[in-house]
Every structure is written in structure tokens, then in C-alpha cells.
């Protein structure tokens, strides 16, 4: 068998040095950033996975392309890596953090380290240089308070800062902050005080939503308030919403961002946001804050810019009224503080236009809370005037009330108006202690009714369900129900409390009383929002559970989700990802295996293999037979059973070596074939790119032809327009000539009229010639471009078919054919227009001839007055124009015919190209199939090898774990007798102590009663007896507390005694200690009795003294002396006897408490040991500890 393993390892090691990535990500995991990797033996030895990715894309780097290159960053793990663009002079390195912020040199600031801090200048390779004017000892300014460099030795302070160094806030301001444009923050104090300072009781608190588990209470609404769909991305852990219409959708913040956010004034609200598709122009209403009847909005970016598409960016908004923060409308200081005190809505725009999608993440609101931590100096501590109290002067002091309850803490406090100057309620003004307000008489309303604040003499019924009582809020005069039943909350008792669900008023259907959520103990009871208050659907399942009631295991887990022990609930399937289906596992934990895999976790390859693996199997069987024969020979030689000829052994070794060389040669041939195939594929891609570029050139040529055709159309239209104008001119001339009265020869005035007519005819003839020339030029250009386009098509198709590689883009060629059809149609249209132009020109020519004939028939016209030669020349031009148009028409017809031939030739070439493409596609698919099969066989071999190694490693680790568990169990078993002894001793001591202290508690109670009687008798020694009473109370309370603690310990120890009854015989060893405790308890009892006797004597003495005091007439001087002596003896007796006894009782009680604490600590240790034993017992494997060997040699 060792030889068999050696052969398998050799075979796989020869195939492992180079491997290309396959579809099995478990073998070559490059996070989708690379398609190639190699095997690294050293990496496999260190991490268990030896595949290292090559040529990572998207600016990534690392073994699995899991990180960005140096100088790049990304917000999330799956995002693209973006360049840091750090300024080379101002940054320490080219690296940046996950937000793209670079590490700057001294004196440099900015996200890219591209500018100097205030007080610095001249950015160089060493950073920025500090302004020497600020370093001058005469100009020692506080950087947080200056508005710029000092001027002539004097610091220039910000508006709210004062002092020679600009290091103090002006009166009415506090918290000097360099990031505040004003320098300091104005005191708020609800307008009641202008004196304040930074509070030292508050620390920084961030209210965040990171969406790690769900939408965290966020919602999405339309602009009109109707709900929209909000989705949570488990992969990116953010939320997003999409729009199907132009109306925008808004993200709506949950309650934790609302309410009284007064301590967030001047701080920031930030979030990560990106938008995909749609319009990306910011609006003035991108971020909306509402509260206290006020509403302000702000854009995400300046309105002239555009939001980046598909790029996550952090947006930050400062919560104050400064104009630089772009809130609109601009509120006053107190209006902004009033809005934050009662913030009712925070909305952030999600979509921009139709089919737009917006994503939001990492929403953070900087706030503060009164706990220890990083200080929050922006929270104020007001110094209140008379009549006010509280940190912010928000309450009225005792003896004062609000002049207007509607204004709440903004209202002025005025003195109470009660009879006798009594105190009153600071909010309502109602007088206390029977003092009535003389101006107002309030009716005494029964339960279920309340006083109308506008008419205190009348009662109105409470708007509460089932007649619960109610009250009126003084600030808002809102009627709020009190004493809602368990599980019900709300101003009208209309909502179910947290942890309950139902519909008590039936607002969403039938009435359903509130009842506890049924989540099967699979939620965190300390968390809020575990279930939907209306439907009861569980929202925060834990222990790997899921479902409406957390009664199912999550995908990829199995077990009993209803088990009482969390460890027995849902556990991971632990399926081999390479051999199992992605559906998870069955209810018993067994995995659903892919074909060819088996085992509980699909970690073993099945015996049946695909048919394509038969040749590999046959070859491996032959190798196995040869290895078995070699193993038999070696065994004989080692056993001495016979002498094996060296020649036979050498022959077998040579055969094995030859077989291994054949395997190596086959692997190298396969690698060479794969490399050759890769080169061929690269050549095909290169030729395809070249062909694509030629097709692009052809597209451009066709576009130029179409542009020239458009120009030709324009020129034809111009020619048509000129012909129309010429016809109109000729018609006007004819009409004028027809209306002309030709006089006799003796009345002839001159040749000027006919001369002008001849000139007009000449001008029209010249325009016809020019139009015909333009048509001829355009036709020639169109023909040239058509020939060029046809030549390009022939050349591209010829090269594509002749190369036999790549597949021509059929859609592009078909588009070119369509464009040729359009060109042909255009040429036909031009032909028709040219024909029409020829007809119009001929008509004009005939009309001109008729005019000329009319002129020649005129009588009495002298040849000299009418230039006959000029008319003949015009006629010749018209004839030449007609012939020119005829010639152009012939050329157009020839071009049309040629276009038809070219079309047929192009279609034939296209058909040839398609057939060639089909052949090349077939060859390419066969090559890809062969390549994929080879890679799959290689990957399967690699996977099998590593599976065997993993199994061997797990078996060795399991063997070690079994040995460790066994040793722990044996050690724990040895400690059982010692633990049992400790538990028995503790039980005995606890019982004896309990019995001993029982009488001490009763005696202490009697002492307390006696001290109380003594207090009532004598007023002169009231202070001493009072202290005695206080001490007795403390002693009694301690005794009672110890008694209760002993009772609880007794109940716990009874459970232990039931399991350890066999140890009762060993209790005798501790009787001495018990006897000592009893003796001390008896001493305590005796002293307590003595204390009782002493107290009784003291009481008798005090009775006598009081008796004497009640009879002053019968007391003489001797009686007074006797009275003083008795009083002195009573005091001495109390100080010398009673007080030491009480001190001793207190000391005994303290010692008993110490003994009880030691007992509790010992019992806790014993219980911890018992719990540890139970864990060891649960973790021990069932059955026999001595397992058989995995292999028999």
C-alpha cells in the first residue's frame, strides 16, 4: 500500500506545476479577478491551498486577487479598485485607506494631501512650511481661534473669539473649536441664560446604521408619502430602492435618528450613497429635516454638478445654520435648535428619474450621552438665573411655574401664585399642600375622564380603549392614555409594545389583542424589534435559525431549531463545496452529492466515472499492477524468502521509470497542445479585432456616402427651386410681352426693351448650365464613393473568408447591405429628380424658343436694334444644356445598373463569409471542448490528491483529539472524590451556621424593640437612643438579609445533597468546627440576653426619672441631686455596657457575613467544576475509546 500511495503522488505531482483556472472556484479561487493561476508547493504547505492567481484584473493583487494594488483602494470587498491619486509631494506614500484618504506629511491636509494647513505654505517634497509670522514670539496665536495669519504682531480672531492670543470665547459663547467658522458656539440654554461652559459629563456617541443584518428600521416612500419597496443586499450589506417612474423615492430614517437630537447641534450627519442609471442632477430637496413645524432641505452636491454614476461616495452635512452648510431656508440659531429638539423626519433622496436605483450605507449621526468616554465638548452646561434649573435651564425652580405651558422649556418661569406662598407644579401651575389657586377652579374628574385645558371646570371622556385613565400633556395639550394593559402601548393604547404583536383597535383588519411574539427562544430577549408588531413575524432570528417564527434552520444548516439547548440547535452542514450540490444538506446533515461523489459530506469520489475517463482508468490499472508486482518483489527480498535476481528488479524499475517518463511526456504534450491552442485562440481574437476595425471603416465610408447623398439631395432641391423661379420669370415675361402694344416703325423708340429681355434669357440659360455642372460633379462624387465602399466590402469579406479564423459580425455586414440598399434607393430618387429637372429645363427651353419666335415675327423691328447674334448664342447654350442633362441621365442609369451588380456580388460574398464562419465556429467549439475536458481531468486529479491529504490530516488530528479528551476525562474522574468532599463540607457548615444564627436574629429583633421603647421615654437622651436604634436596625437588616441568603443557599444545597447522600458518613470529621460555631453562637445569645437585661434596667431607671419629672412640687434639692445621679448612672450604663454589646453584635454579624461569602465562593467553584465535568462528558465520543487501526499493513 505505501508503494501505491507513492505512485499516485508521483502521477499527480507531475501534472500540478501549471494549471489554468476552471469553473471550480474551490481549486483556483481568484475572486472573479483572474482566469489563470499556478500551483505553489510552498504556499500549499503553509495554507493548505497551493493555487496562486496570475494576471489579476481591476487593479487587484494578492494570492487570490483579494486586495488592491499599491496606490489603489475600494470601499467594499467586491467593488472595483480605484486610484488613490495621492499627491507625490504631500503624501507619505502612494497608499490610502478604504475611503480614499491619503497619509499626509507634516503641515499638509486634504483627502489627496494636495494643500497646506492654515498657517503653512509652500508645498514641497518635505511637506508644507509653517508661516514664520505665526512662529514669532510676539504673535503666539491659538490656531483654533484665528481667522488668518497675524497682522503686525496682532492675532486676527474669529467672530466669536477674543483675547490677545484668540484663545477665549466671547461672552455668551463656549467650546473653542478650530473646525467652527465662528470659532465658538453660542450658548443655547433655551434662551434663559447667556452664560455656559462645556459639560464634562457627556461623551461622544454615534448613532449608526450599517445594515449588517437587515434594513435596521429604514423605509422607502414616494414623494407623496406612499410606501415604496426597500431591499437589503446581503452581499454588500446595504439597502437600496428603485424607481419605475419619474417621481423620486426617499429613504426614511428610523426612530433612533429622531426625537430630541439637541446634543447633535454643530455635529455631522454622514452616509455612503451611490446612484445607478437615471438622471443624476442633484436637487434642492435631496436631504430633508423636519420638526417643530419647521422644514429645511439641502442638495447632495452643488446644483451645477452631476452625481457620479455607480460610484459610492461619502456625503457629510453639518447640523447648524451657517450659510456654508447650504440648508434652505436659512433658519435662525434658536429655530435650528428648536427643530433638532423635536426632529420628526429625516429623509434622503434615493432615486433620480425613471428606472433609477439608489444605494445607501454607513449612516452616522454624531451625538453625545451622559456616560464616561471620549469627551463631547460641544454639549453645554448652563449657569441658570433665579427661577430656573437643569443642565440647559430647561426646568422651573421650586416656587416657579411656566407662564405658557405651550412653549415647554422655551417658556418663561414666573413665581407661583398660591395662598400662603406655597409651592406649585412647575408645568401646570397647580398648587400643592392644600393651597389652591384663587383664580382657577378645576373639576374633580372621575377615572376615565380628564379636565379640559380650555375649560378646567368641565370633564371630558378619555379617548382610550376599555375606559383607561388619561392625562393631558402640558406642552402640547395632547391627551395620553395611562395604565395600558400589559403588552399595549401608544398614546391611545392602540399599539402593541415591543415583543408583542396584534391589532388592539382593528385598524388593519379584525381586532386582535396583543400577545407575546412566538419566536421559539431564538431571538435575543435584550434586543428591541425582535418581531413585527402587527403580524408577529420574527425579524432577528439567532442560533442560525430562520422562518416566520424562527422555527427553521437557515440555508446551509441543519438540526433541531426548537431544541432547548442552543448548542443542539442548527449546525453548519459542512458539505464539501466541490462535491456537493449548492442546495445545502438534508435534515439529518447528510449532503446532496454531485454525480461522481459520495460520502456523508460528498468528500469521496464515487467508483463510477464518466465514459471519457475510461482510457485514464485503464492506464492507471496497468500502473497499479506493475506497482503491485514491484511491491511483491520488494517484500520477498526483505523477508528473505528467496533471492530476487537483480536483473529482474532492474528491469522492473526501468519499466516503472519508462512509464513515468511516458506520463511526463504525455503531460508535456498536453501542455504544448494547450499552449498552441491558446496561441491559435489569441490569433483568432486578433484577426477578429482586425476584421472588426475594417468593418468600422466600412461603416464610416457608408456614412460618408450617405452624407454626400444628402448633399446631392440638397443641391437637387436648389436646382428645382431655380427652375421654378425661371419658369415664373418666363411666365411674367410672356405675359408682359403679350400685353405689349408694338407701335409702327415710325413710332419705334429704341431697342432697349428687347435687349433687356435677351439679357434675362441669357441669365436663365447660364443658371441652367451651372445647375447641370453641379449635378454632374455630385454624380461623379457619388459614383466614386460607391466604388470605394464596394471595394472595402470585397476586401473585408475576402480576408475574413480566406483566413478561416474568427467569425465575421453578421449583424454588421447585414447592416452594411441595408445601407447599400438605402444608397441605391437614394440614387434612384436622384435619377427621378434629375429627369424631372431635365423636363423642366426642356420646357423652359421651348418656352424661350416661343418667345424668340414671337420676337422674330414682330414687324418694324430693326436687326440692328435686336442683337440676333446674342439670341443665337443663348440658343446654343440651351442646346448644350439639354445635351448635358441627357448625358448625365445616361451616367445615372449606368450607375444604377452597376449598383445592382455590386449588390448581388456583395450578397454572394456575404454568403461565403457566413459559411466560412460556421466552419470556423465548429472548429473552435471542438478545440474548446477538448481543452475543457483536459482541464477538467487535470483539476479532478488535483482535487483527488488534496482530498486524500486532507482526509489523512483530519484522521491524525482526530486521533490526537481523542487522546486529549481521554486524558481530560481521566483527570476529571480523579477530581470527583475531592469535589464531593468539598461539597459535603460546605453543606454541613452551612446548616450549622444557619441553626446558630437563627437565635441571633431573634435576639437582635428584641434588642431593636427595646431600643425603640427607650426612644419614646426620654427626650433628653433622644440623640443617644436614636443612634442605638439605628445600629439595631442595621444589625437586624443584616441578619434578615443573611437569613434570606441562607434560605436560597439551603434550597440549592438540597439538590446537591440528593446526589451526594453516600457522603454523609464523612461529615463527622467537621464536628469540632461545628461545635465551635455553636459555642460562639451561644456566647452571642448570652450577650444578647445580658443586653436585654441592661436595656430593661435602663428603662426602669428612665421610668423613675420620668415619674420624678411629672411631680416637680414634691422634689427638693436632695431629690434633684438624686435625679442627676440616676441620670448620670443611666448614661454611664448605656455607654459602658449597652454600646459595647451592640458593637460586638455588629462585629459578629460582619464575621458571619464573611463566612457566608467564603461559602458562596467555594460553592461557585464547585458548581463550575461540575459544569466542566458535564461538558467533558458531553464531548466524549460514544462507544469504546480504543478504536481500531485505519489500515492493516
Curated annotation (Swiss-Prot):
Subcellular location: Secreted, Extracellular space, Extracellular matrix, Basement membrane
Coarse class of the protein's main subcellular location: secreted
Family matches, as InterPro entries: EGF-like_dom, Laminin/Netrin_ECM, Laminin_IV, LE_dom
PROSITE patterns: EGF_1 (PS00022), EGF_2 (PS01186), EGF_LAM_1 (PS01248), EGF_LAM_2 (PS50027), LAMININ_IVA (PS51115)
Disulfide partners: 28-37, 30-53, 56-65, 68-81, 84-96, 86-102, 104-113, 116-128, 139-150, 141-155, 157-166, 169-184, 462-470, 464-481, 484-493, 496-514, 517-531, 519-538, 541-550, 553-570, 573-585, 575-591, 593-602
Matching Pfam families: EGF_laminin, Laminin_B
Tissue: The large variant is expressed only in specific epithelial cells of embryonic and neonatal tissues. In 17-week old embryo the small variant is found in cerebral cortex, lung, and distal tubes of kidney, but not in epithelia except for distal tubuli.
Glycosylation: residue positions: 342, 362, 803, 805, 942, 1033
Domain Laminin IV type A residues, every copy: 213-381
UniProt feature coiled coil, ranges: 611-718, 811-1076, 1117-1193
GO cellular component, as recorded: cell cortex; collagen-containing extracellular matrix; extracellular region; extracellular space; laminin-2 complex; perinuclear region of cytoplasm
SMART domains: EGF, EGF_Lam, LamB
UniProt keyword S-adenosyl-L-methionine, yes or no: no
GO biological process terms held by the UniProt record: cell adhesion; epidermis development; positive regulation of cell migration; positive regulation of cell population proliferation
PTM field: O-glycosylated; contains chondroitin sulfate (CS). CS attachment is on either Ser-803 or Ser-805.
Alphabetical keyword list: Basement membrane, Cell adhesion, Coiled coil, Disulfide bond, Epidermolysis bullosa, Extracellular matrix, Glycoprotein, Heparin-binding, Laminin EGF-like domain, Proteoglycan, Repeat, Secreted, Signal
Span of the signal peptide: 1-21
Molecular function as annotated in GO: heparin binding
Subunit architecture: Laminin is a complex glycoprotein, consisting of three different polypeptide chains (alpha, beta, gamma), which are bound to each other by disulfide bonds into a cross-shaped molecule comprising one long and three short arms with globules at each end. Gamma-2 is a subunit of laminin-5 (laminin-332 or epiligrin/kalinin/nicein).
Additional detail: Binds heparin.
Function noted in UniProt: Binding to cells via a high affinity receptor, laminin is thought to mediate the attachment, migration and organization of cells into tissues during embryonic development by interacting with other extracellular matrix components. Ladsin exerts cell-scattering activity toward a wide variety of cells, including epithelial, endothelial, and fibroblastic cells.
Domain comment in the entry: The alpha-helical domains I and II are thought to interact with other laminin chains to form a coiled coil structure. Domain IV is globular.
Disease note: Epidermolysis bullosa, junctional 3A, intermediate: A form of epidermolysis bullosa, a genodermatosis characterized by recurrent blistering, fragility of the skin and mucosal epithelia, and erosions caused by minor mechanical trauma. JEB3A is an autosomal recessive, intermediate form in which blistering lesions occur between the epidermis and the dermis at the lamina lucida level of the basement membrane zone. Epidermolysis bullosa, junctional 3B, severe: A form of epidermolysis bullosa, a genodermatosis characterized by recurrent blistering, fragility of the skin and mucosal epithelia, and erosions caused by minor mechanical trauma. JEB3B is an autosomal recessive form in which blistering lesions occur between the epidermis and the dermis at the lamina lucida level of the basement membrane zone.
Protein name stated in the entry: Laminin subunit gamma-2
High-level lineage: Eukaryota, Metazoa, Chordata, Craniata, Vertebrata
Amino acid at each position: 500500500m505505501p508503494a501505491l500511495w507513492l505512485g499516485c503522488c508521483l502521477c499527480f505531482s507531475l501534472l500540478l506545476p501549471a494549471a489554468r483556472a476552471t469553473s471550480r472556484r474551490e481549486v483556483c479561487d481568484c475572486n472573479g479577478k483572474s482566469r489563470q493561476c499556478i500551483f505553489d508547493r510552498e504556499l500549499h504547505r503553509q495554507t493548505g491551498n497551493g493555487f496562486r492567481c496570475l494576471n489579476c484584473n481591476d487593479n487587484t493583487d494578492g494570492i487570490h486577487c483579494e486586495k488592491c494594488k499599491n496606490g489603489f483602494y475600494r470601499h467594499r470587498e467586491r467593488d472595483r479598485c480605484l486610484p488613490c491619486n495621492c499627491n507625490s509631494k504631500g503624501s507619505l506614500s502612494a497608499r490610502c485607506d478604504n475611503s480614499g484618504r491619503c497619509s499626509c506629511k507634516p503641515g499638509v491636509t486634504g483627502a489627496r494631501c494636495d494643500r497646506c494647513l492654515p498657517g503653512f505654505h509652500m508645498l514641497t517634497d518635505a511637506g508644507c512650511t509653517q508661516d514664520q509670522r505665526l512662529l514669532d514670539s510676539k504673535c503666539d496665536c491659538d490656531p483654533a481661534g484665528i481667522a488668518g495669519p497675524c497682522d503686525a504682531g496682532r492675532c486676527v480672531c474669529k467672530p466669536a473669539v477674543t483675547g490677545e492670543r484668540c484663545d477665549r470665547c466671547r461672552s455668551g459663547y463656549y467650546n473653542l473649536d478650530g473646525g467652527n467658522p465662528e470659532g465658538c458656539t453660542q450658548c443655547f440654554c433655551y434662551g434663559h441664560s447667556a452664560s455656559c461652559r462645556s459639560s464634562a459629563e457627556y461623551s461622544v456617541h454615534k448613532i449608526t446604521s450599517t445594515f449588517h443584518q437587515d434594513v435596521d428600521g429604514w423605509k422607502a416612500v414616494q414623494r407623496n408619502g406612499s410606501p415604496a419597496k426597500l431591499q437589503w443586499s446581503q452581499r454588500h450589506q446595504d439597502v437600496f430602492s428603485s424607481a419605475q417612474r419619474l417621481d423620486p423615492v426617499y429613504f426614511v430614517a428610523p426612530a433612533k435618528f429622531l426625537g430630541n437630537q439637541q446634543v447633535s447641534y454643530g455635529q455631522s450627519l454622514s452616509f455612503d450613497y451611490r446612484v445607478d442609471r437615471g438622471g443624476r442632477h442633484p436637487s434642492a430637496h435631496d436631504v430633508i429635516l423636519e420638526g417643530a413645524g419647521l422644514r429645511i432641505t439641502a442638495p447632495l452636491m452643488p446644483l451645477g454638478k452631476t452625481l457620479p454614476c455607480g460610484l459610492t461616495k461619502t456625503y457629510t452635512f453639518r447640523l447648524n445654520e451657517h450659510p456654508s452648510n447650504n440648508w434652505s431656508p436659512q433658519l435662525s440659531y434658536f429655530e435650528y435648535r428648536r427643530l433638532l429638539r423635536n426632529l420628526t423626519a429625516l429623509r434622503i433622496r434615493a432615486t433620480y428619474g425613471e428606472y433609477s436605483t439608489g444605494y445607501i450605507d454607513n449612516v452616522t449621526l454624531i451625538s453625545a450621552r451622559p456616560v464616561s468616554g471620549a469627551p463631547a465638548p460641544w454639549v453645554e452646561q448652563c449657569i441658570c438665573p433665579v427661577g430656573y434649573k437643569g443642565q440647559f435651564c430647561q426646568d422651573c425652580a421650586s416656587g416657579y411655574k411656566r407662564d405658557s405651558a405651550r412653549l415647554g422649556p422655551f417658556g418663561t418661569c414666573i413665581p407661583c401664585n398660591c395662598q400662603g406662598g406655597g409651592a406649585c407644579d412647575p408645568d401646570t401651575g397647580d398648587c400643592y399642600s392644600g393651597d389652591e389657586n384663587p383664580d382657577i377652579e378645576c373639576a374633580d374628574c372621575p377615572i376615565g375622564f380628564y379636565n379640559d385645558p380650555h375649560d378646567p371646570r368641565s370633564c371630558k371622556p378619555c379617548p382610550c380603549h376599555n375606559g383607561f385613565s388619561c392625562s393631558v400633556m402640558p406642552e402640547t395639550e395632547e391627551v395620553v392614555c395611562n395604565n395600558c394593559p400589559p403588552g399595549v402601548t401608544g398614546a391611545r393604547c392602540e399599539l402593541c409594545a415591543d415583543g408583542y404583536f396584534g391589532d388592539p383597535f382593528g385598524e388593519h383588519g379584525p381586532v386582535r389583542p396583543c400577545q407575546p411574539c412566538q419566536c421559539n427562544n431564538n431571538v435575543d430577549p435584550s434586543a428591541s424589534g425582535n418581531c413585527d408588531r402587527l403580524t408577529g413575524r420574527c425579524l432577528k432570528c439567532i442560533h442560525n435559525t430562520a422562518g416566520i417564527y424562527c422555527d427553521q434552520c437557515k440555508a446551509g444548516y441543519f438540526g433541531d431549531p426548537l431544541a432547548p439547548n442552543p448548542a443542539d440547535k442548527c449546525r453548519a452542514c459542512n458539505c464539501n463545496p466541490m462535491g456537493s450540490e449548492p442546495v445545502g444538506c438534508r435534515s439529518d446533515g447528510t449532503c446532496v452529492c454531485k454525480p461522481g461523489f459520495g460520502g456523508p459530506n460528498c468528500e469521496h469520489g464515487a467508483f463510477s466515472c464518466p465514459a471519457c475517463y475510461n482510457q485514464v482508468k485503464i492506464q492507471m490499472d496497468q500502473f497499479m499492477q506493475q506497482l503491485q508486482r514491484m511491491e511483491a518483489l520488494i517484500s520477498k527480498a526483505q523477508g528473505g524468502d528467496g533471492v530476487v535476481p537483480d536483473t529482474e528488479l532492474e528491469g522492473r524499475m526501468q519499466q516503472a521509470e519508462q512509464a513515468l517518463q511516458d506520463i511526463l511526456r504525455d503531460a508535456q504534450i498536453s501542455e504544448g497542445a494547450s499552449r498552441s491552442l491558446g496561441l491559435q485562440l489569441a490569433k483568432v481574437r486578433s484577426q477578429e479585432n482586425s476584421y472588426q476595425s475594417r468593418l468600422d471603416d466600412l461603416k464610416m465610408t457608408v456614412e460618408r456616402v450617405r452624407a454626400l447623398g444628402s448633399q446631392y439631395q440638397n443641391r437637387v432641391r436648389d436646382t428645382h427651386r431655380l427652375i421654378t423661379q425661371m419658369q415664373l420669370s418666363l411666365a411674367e415675361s410672356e405675359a408682359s410681352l403679350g400685353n405689349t402694344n408694338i407701335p409702327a416703325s415710325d413710332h419705334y423708340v429704341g431697342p432697349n426693351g428687347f435687349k433687356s429681355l435677351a439679357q434675362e434669357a441669357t441669365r436663365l440659360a447660364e443658371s441652367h448650365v451651372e445647375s447641370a455642372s453641379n449635378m454632374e460633379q455630385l454624380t461623379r462624387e457619388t459614383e466614386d464613393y460607391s466604388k470605394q465602399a464596394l471595394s472595402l466590402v470585397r476586401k473585408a469579406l475576402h480576408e475574413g473568408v480566406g483566413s478561416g479564423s474568427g467569425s465575421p459580425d453578421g449583424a454588421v455586414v447585414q447592416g452594411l447591405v441595408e445601407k447599400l440598399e438605402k444608397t441605391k434607393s437614394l440614387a434612384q430618387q436622384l435619377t427621378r429628380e434629375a429627369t424631372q429637372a431635365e423636363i423642366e429645363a426642356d420646357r423652359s427651353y421651348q418656352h424661350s424658343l416661343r418667345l424668340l419666335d414671337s420676337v422674330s415675327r414682330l414687324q418694324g423691328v430693326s436687326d440692328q436694334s435686336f442683337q440676333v447674334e446674342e439670341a443665337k448664342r443663348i440658343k446654343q447654350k440651351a442646346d448644350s444644356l439639354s445635351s448635358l442633362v441627357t448625358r448625365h441621365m445616361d451616367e445615372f442609369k449606368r450607375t444604377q445598373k452597376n449598383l445592382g451588380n455590386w449588390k448581388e456580388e456583395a450578397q454572394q460574398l456575404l454568403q461565403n463569409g457566413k459559411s466560412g464562419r460556421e466552419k470556423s465556429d465548429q472548429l473552435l467549439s471542438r478545440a474548446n471542448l477538448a481543452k475543457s475536458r483536459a482541464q477538467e481531468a487535470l483539476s479532478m486529479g488535483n482535487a483527488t490528491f488534496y482530498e486524500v491529504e486532507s482526509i489523512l490530516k483530519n484522521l491524525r488530528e482526530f486521533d490526537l483529539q481523542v487522546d486529549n479528551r481521554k486524558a481530560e476525562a481521566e483527570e476529571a474522574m480523579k477530581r470527583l472524590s475531592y469535589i464531593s468532599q468539598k461539597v459535603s463540607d460546605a453543606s454541613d457548615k452551612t446548616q450549622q451556621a444557619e441553626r446558630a444564627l437563627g437565635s441571633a436574629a431573634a435576639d437582635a429583633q428584641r434588642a431593636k424593640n427595646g431600643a425603640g421603647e427607650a426612644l419614646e421615654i426620654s427626650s433628653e437622651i433622644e440623640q443617644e437612643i436614636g443612634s442605638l436604634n439605628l445600629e439595631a436596625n442595621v444589625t437586624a437588616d443584616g441578619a434578615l438579609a443573611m437569613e434570606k441568603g441562607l434560605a436560597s443557599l439551603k434550597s440549592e444545597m438540597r439538590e446537591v445533597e440528593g446526589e451526594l447522600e453516600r457522603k454523609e458518613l464523612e461529615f463527622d470529621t467537621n464536628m469540632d468546627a461545628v461545635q465551635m460555631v455553636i459555642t460562639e453562637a451561644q456566647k452571642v445569645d448570652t450577650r444578647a440576653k445580658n443586653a436585654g437585661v441592661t436595656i430593661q434596667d435602663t428603662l426602669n431607671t428612665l421610668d423613675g426619672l420620668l415619674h420624678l419629672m411629672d411631680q416637680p412640687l414634691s422634689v427638693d434639692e436632695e431629690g434633684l441631686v438624686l435625679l442627676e445621679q440616676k441620670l448620670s448612672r443611666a448614661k454611664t450604663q448605656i455607654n459602658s455596657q449597652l454600646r459595647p454589646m451592640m458593637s460586638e453584635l455588629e462585629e459578629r454579624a460582619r464575621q458571619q457575613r464573611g463566612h457566608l461569602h467564603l461559602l458562596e465562593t467555594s460553592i461557585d467553584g464547585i458548581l463550575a467544576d461540575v459544569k466542566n465535568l458535564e461538558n467533558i462528558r458531553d464531548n466524549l465520543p460514544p462507544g469504546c475509546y480504543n478504536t481500531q487501526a485505519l489500515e492493516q499493513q
